[in-house]
Each structure stands twice: as C-alpha cells, then as structure tokens.
Regions:
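Acidic, surface-exposed loops and disordered segments
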Residues: 1-169
Length: 169
C-alpha cells in the first residue's frame, strides 16, 4: 500500500473492539520514536503508555471510545530545540506532532485504529499522572482495533479545494 492510500484510509476511530492491544503491536508503534524527525534530532518526545490507568484517564476525557490503550505524548522542556532568533519559539509541540503522526500512520499500516485527542486538560492530566514538571503534555492518542461497526465521520472525506489552502509566495 502506498503512502497516499494509507493516509486516505486512516480515520479517527470512535468505537473500538473489545480486544487488547498486543505488546508486539505496541512495540512496533513505539519504534516510530526512534525514526521520526525532530528539531536537530534532539528527540525530546516522551510517550507514556496508559493501559493500566484507563479509568483514571476517563475522568479527564470523554474521547477514549473504549480503546484498550492510550498513549500520552509529552516533551521535555529542557531538551527541545530553542530558536535563538525568536525567543519563546521552541520545537516541543511540533516534535510531538511529528512523532504522533508517524505512530498514527504506522498504526493504520498495522491494521490498528487511532484517535488523536486534544479534548482534555493537559495541566490536570500532568497532575493526575505525576508528569515531571520539566515535561509538557501535548496530546493523547487512543490505539486499538476498530470495532466492526466503526466508520469514518461524515466529513472525513470532505476537503476544501486545494487553491483555498495553498498560497504561492
């Protein structure tokens, strides 16, 4: 399967099968941490696997949809790249997004579904899960097997025309 086909087939899963995620599958996903590009290859991204604390996580977001595993993506604020030209600009959130996208697409390749979650309170999550103060939570990602009746959202395949999204300089 080519990249474009893989990317088009991927969708946000909102209903997961009652089937555990095998450690081998999780390990294959986490290998993406080693190959995804990050600014200056500093690799400040951390992933916390949350299979054991799903009930605690359910108190912080309604977006788990029965997934057997949730990955939490953080970055180490002491290790991300800082832009010396513009203060306050650093790479942590971008690095996390790149790694998370790699994991999301690898999951699709492996026959797994994912849900990218931004609908949670990062500070409350950091407190509830004792995230070190030098790490910042960026997103959560559900991972598991999609239920047989799971399907893409109604607007999944709708896109704006390309000329509305591209500006040539």
């Amino acid at each position: 399967m080519g990249f474009m086909e893989l990317a088009k087939e991927r969708y946000t899963v909102r209903k997961y099968a009652d089937k555990p995620l095998e450690k081998e599958q999780l390990d294959k996903l986490l290998e993406c941490l080693l190959i995804a590009p990050t600014a200056k290859n500093l690799q400040p991204v951390r992933v916390i696997e949350g299979e054991k604390n799903l009930a605690k996580l359910d108190e912080l977001t309604k977006c788990r949809y029965g997934a057997p595993c949730v990955l939490a993506f953080t970055y180490n604020k002491d290790e991300d790249w800082k832009n010396s030209i513009e203060s306050g600009f650093h790479s942590g959130e971008q690095d996390v997004s790149i790694v998370a996208t790699h994991i999301m697409l690898r999951a699709q390749e492996l026959g797994l579904g994912t849900t990218w979650i931004n609908w949670y309170a990062p500070v409350a999550f950091e407190r509830a899960f004792d995230i070190p103060v030098n790490e910042s939570s960026v997103l959560l990602m559900c991972v598991g097997y999609a239920a047989d009746d799971a399907h893409p959202a109604r607007m999944h395949s709708e896109t704006r025309p390309l000329d509305e999204m591209v500006r040539y300089l």
